C-alpha cells in the first residue's frame, strides 16, 4: 500500500524509514483563531515548525506522522510550506478530535455522513488540495466514550473499511478508553493491526498496555517529555519492560510534540514545571541511549521506528 505524503508523491510503505508516529507541526483552537487572528503569528509558527523538523531530521528522521485534524487546527497549506522548507516526508490525517460533543453542524447527521467526510479527505484531498489523508485520527479522554465520541469512532471504522487506511487514536491511559476504542473498532470489522492506540505511555500499568497489544493493535508510547502525565524515567522503564517481555513488534514511540500550541495549559511559563524536557528530539537524547545501555540492540530500535510504521501503513 502506498502512503500519501504532503507536498510530495506518495511512497511505498517499505520506504517510510525512521518515523516519528505522533508529532504536531502546529496546534491551535480553530474558533479562537478565526475570531481573533491578532493573537497568532503565523511567521513565528512556521519558523518553529521548520526549526523543530530540521532538528529531528539531524537524528535521521525521515517521516513524521502529524495527527492534527479537525479540532486541533489542521491546515494542509501550512503543512505544505513546512515540507517545502525542510524536505521531510509528512503524513497528514483526517478525523475529528473531540472529548464530549460534536459541533452543532453534526446534529441530526448520521455516522455515514461523518465517514463520508473522512473518505473525501482520503480519496479526493484535504481542504481543496490534492494532498490526501493517510490515516484517520479519533479521540477519547476523561469523559469516556460519549455518544458523539462513539459516532466518530464508528465513522472512522467505515472509512477504514472503504479505504484501508489505518487509525490512530488519542486515549486516556487511566480509564480504559483505549480498550474501548479498540473494542468498538474491531466490532465494526477493523483489523486490529490497523489500529494504533495512542498515549498508552502515560501509564506504567504494564498489564493494561499488554491487553491492548495482545488483541493485535499497536501501542503508542508517544508522549515522551510530557512529565505532567508520566516522567521520562518511568516511561523508559515501561518501554524497556515491554521490549524485554517480547512486545517490540507492537511498540511505536514518539513525543506528541507541538512545535506551537495555543492551549492555556501550554503557556510558556508552565513548561518548566509540567514538561521541562519536552522536545521533538528527547527520545534520541535520552530514551534510545537508555534502551541501548540496557541491552536493546539496533535491530529492535529499527523494529520500533521503521518496521512497525511500515507494517501499520502496509
UniProtKB/Swiss-Prot annotation:
Entry binding sites for Co(2+): 137, 170, 199
Cofactor: Co(2+); Fe cation
GO process annotations (BP): catabolic process
Binding residue positions for Fe cation: 22, 24, 137, 256
Tagged with keyword Hydrolase: yes
Enzyme class: hydrolase
pH dependence: Optimum pH is 7.0-9.0.
Residues with N6-carboxylysine modification: 137
Note describing how the cofactor binds: Binds 1 Co(2+) ion per subunit. Binds 1 Fe cation per subunit.
Gene Ontology MF term list: aryldialkylphosphatase activity; zinc ion binding
Reaction equation(s) it catalyzes: An aryl dialkyl phosphate + H2O = dialkyl phosphate + an aryl alcohol
Keyword annotations from UniProtKB, A to Z: Cobalt, Hydrolase, Iron, Metal-binding
Activity regulation remarks: Inactivated by EDTA and o-phenanthroline.
Record flagged with keyword Nucleotide-binding: no
Enzyme Commission designation: 3.1.8.1
Residues in coiled coil: none
Temperature dependence: Thermostable.
CDD domains to which the protein is assigned, alphabetical: PTE
Function: Has a low paraoxonase activity. Also active, but with a lower activity, against other organo-phosphorus insecticides such as Dursban, Coumaphos, pNP-butanoate or parathion.
Family as reported in the entry's similarity comment: Belongs to the metallo-dependent hydrolases superfamily. Phosphotriesterase family.
Protein name listed in UniProt: Aryldialkylphosphatase
Organism: Saccharolobus solfataricus (strain ATCC 35092 / DSM 1617 / JCM 11322 / P2)
Amino acid at each position: 500500500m502506498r502512503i500519501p505524503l504532503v507536498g510530495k508523491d506518495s511512497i511505498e510503505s517499505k520506504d517510510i524509514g525512521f518515523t516519528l508516529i505522533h508529532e504536531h507541526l502546529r496546534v491551535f483552537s480553530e474558533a479562537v483563531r478565526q475570531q481573533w487572528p491578532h493573537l497568532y503569528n503565523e511567521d513565528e509558527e512556521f519558523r518553529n515548525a521548520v526549526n523543530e523538523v530540521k532538528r529531528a531530521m539531524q537524528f535521521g528522521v525521515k517521516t513524521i506522522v502529524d495527527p492534527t485534524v479537525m479540532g486541533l487546527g489542521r491546515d494542509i497549506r501550512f503543512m505544505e510550506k513546512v515540507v517545502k522548507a525542510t524536505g521531510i516526508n509528512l503524513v497528514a490525517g483526517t478525523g475529528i478530535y473531540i472529548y464530549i460533543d460534536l459541533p452543532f453542524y453534526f446534529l441530526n447527521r448520521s455516522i455515514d455522513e461523518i465517514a463520508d467526510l473522512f473518505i473525501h479527505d482520503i480519496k479526493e484531498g484535504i481542504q481543496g488540495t490534492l494532498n490526501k489523508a493517510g490515516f484517520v485520527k479519533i479521540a477519547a479522554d476523561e469523559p469516556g466514550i460519549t455518544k458523539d465520541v462513539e459516532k466518530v469512532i464508528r465513522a472512522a471504522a467505515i472509512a477504514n473499511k472503504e479505504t484501508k487506511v489505518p487509525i490512530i487514536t488519542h486515549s486516556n491511559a487511566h480509564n480504559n478508553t483505549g480498550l474501548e476504542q479498540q473494542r468498538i473498532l474491531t466490532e465494526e470489522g477493523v483489523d486490529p493491526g490497523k489500529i494504533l492506540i495512542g498515549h498508552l505511555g502515560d501509564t506504567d500499568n504494564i498489564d493494561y498496555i499488554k491487553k491492548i497489544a495482545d488483541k493485535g493493535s499497536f501501542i503508542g508510547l508517544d508522549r515522551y517529555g510530557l512529565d505532567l502525565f508520566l516522567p521520562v524515567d518511568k516511561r523508559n522503564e515501561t518501554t524497556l519492560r515491554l521490549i524485554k517481555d517480547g512486545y517490540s513488534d507492537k511498540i511505536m514511540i514518539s513525543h506528541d510534540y507541538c512545535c506551537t500550541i495555543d492551549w492555556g495549559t501550554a503557556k510558556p511559563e508552565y513548561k518548566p514545571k509540567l514538561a521541562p524536557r519536552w522536545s521533538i528530539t528527547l527520545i534520541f537524547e535520552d530514551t534510545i541511549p537508555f534502551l541501548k545501555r540496557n541491552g536493546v540492540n539496533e535491530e529492535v530500535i529499527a523494529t520500533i521506528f521503521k518496521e512497525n510504521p511500515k507494517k501499520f501503513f502496509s
